[in-house]
Each structure stands twice: as structure tokens, then as C-alpha cells.
């Protein structure tokens, strides 16, 4: 059941918007979940992926325990290239294999002041969401008086 008349659920329209999305929206779509440790530390579930983040592939042919650094984020193709995820071409040269960001987990973030600000903002909004709709002890005591 659709509630918002301004949001479409038409598959072809959603595919069109996905593949014709501008770069600033592709950044948002190309987000990856954080590892359990980082999620605990920052109280944030996922972040848009970025060059120099360290990730671990958790789905597909290249999944495994080794952790690699993101070499390139290719927004046009919706893929990221990771340090050790390569294959050999027929002529013998090695090339990076593109992996979708949803199939990796971020194990270390490259932090700068802007990214720290984003983490704080996301954590704050998450905290507000947890407290929403709950009575505090003082309000309960006042109600009982």
C-alpha cells in the first residue's frame, strides 16, 4: 500500500532514476555498511564509500578475510576498485575487478573534519530516534502526582 502520492513504485521509473542519477545522488546510493566495531564506536550503520577507506568483501566471488584499501570509486559504473581484488586478462595484464559497495563492509574510515561532522550528525539523529516517544522518569513522577 502506497501512502505518498508523489513517490512512484513503478519498476521502470525507479530503474530509470537509478541509472540516470546525477553524481551527488550516486554518492548516496554507493553507501556501504560499517563493521560491527565501527558501528558500536560511532553509532552509525552505513556511510557513502570513499577512496582510501579500508573494506572487506563479504559477498560474491571475491569474499574473504583479507582487507583492502579502496583504490577508486567509479560512480558512473556504480562500482569500487579494491587494492587486492584483481584478475588477469588474456594478454597477461592485471586489472582491478569492480565490486558494488553494498557487497563490502567498511573496516576503517578515512576521517577528515567533514566526515567527522557527518558521523556526529548521523549519530545524533539516531539518538533522537531512540528517545522519541519514551517517557522520562521525571515526567512519569509528575503524572502520578
Curated annotation (Swiss-Prot):
Cellular location(s): Cytoplasm
Phosphothreonine sites (modified residues): 139
GO molecular function: mRNA 5'-UTR binding; RNA binding; structural constituent of ribosome
Main subcellular localisation: cytoplasm
Cellular component terms per the entry's GO annotation: cytoplasm; cytosol; cytosolic large ribosomal subunit; cytosolic ribosome; extracellular exosome; membrane; nucleolus; nucleoplasm
Linked residues for Glycyl lysine isopeptide (Lys-Gly) (interchain with G-Cter in SUMO2): 136
InterPro entries registered for this protein in UniProt: KOW (IPR005824), Rib_uL2_dom2 (IPR014722), Ribosomal_uL24_CS (IPR005825), Ribosomal_uL24_euk/arc (IPR005756), Ribosomal_uL24_KOW (IPR041988), Translation_prot_SH3-like_sf (IPR008991)
Post-translational modification: Ufmylated by UFL1 in response to endoplasmic reticulum stress, promoting reticulophagy of endoplasmic reticulum sheets.
CDD domains tied to this protein: KOW_RPL26
Keyword annotations from UniProtKB, A to Z: Cytoplasm, Diamond-Blackfan anemia, Isopeptide bond, Phosphoprotein, Ribonucleoprotein, Ribosomal protein, Ubl conjugation
Chain segments carrying region Disordered: 1-21, 122-145
Subunit field text: Component of the large ribosomal subunit. Interacts with DHX33.
Family named by the database record: Belongs to the universal ribosomal protein uL24 family.
NCBIfam families: rplX_A_E (TIGR01080)
PANTHER family: 60S RIBOSOMAL PROTEIN L26 FAMILY MEMBER
Name of the protein described by the UniProt record: Large ribosomal subunit protein uL24
Gene that encodes it: RPL26
Amino acid at each position: 500500500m502506497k501512502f505518498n502520492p508523489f513517490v512512484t513504485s513503478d519498476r521502470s521509473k525507479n530503474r530509470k532514476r537509478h541509472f540516470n542519477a546525477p553524481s551527488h545522488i550516486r554518492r548516496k546510493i554507493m553507501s556501504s555498511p560499517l563493521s560491527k566495531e565501527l558501528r558500536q564506536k560511532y553509532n552509525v550503520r552505513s556511510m557513502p564509500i570513499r577512496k582510501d577507506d579500508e573494506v572487506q568483501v563479504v559477498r560474491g566471488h571475491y569474499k574473504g578475510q583479507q582487507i583492502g584499501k579502496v583504490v577508486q570509486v567509479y560512480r558512473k559504473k556504480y562500482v569500487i576498485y579494491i587494492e587486492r581484488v584483481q584478475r588477469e586478462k588474456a594478454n597477461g595484464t592485471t586489472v582491478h575487478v569492480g565490486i558494488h559497495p553494498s557487497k563490502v563492509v567498511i573496516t576503517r574510515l578515512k576521517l577528515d573534519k567533514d566526515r567527522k561532522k557527518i558521523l556526529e550528525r548521523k549519530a545524533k539523529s539516531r539518538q533522537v530516534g531512540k528517545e522519541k516517544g519514551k517517557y522520562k522518569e521525571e515526567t512519569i513522577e509528575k503524572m502520578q502526582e
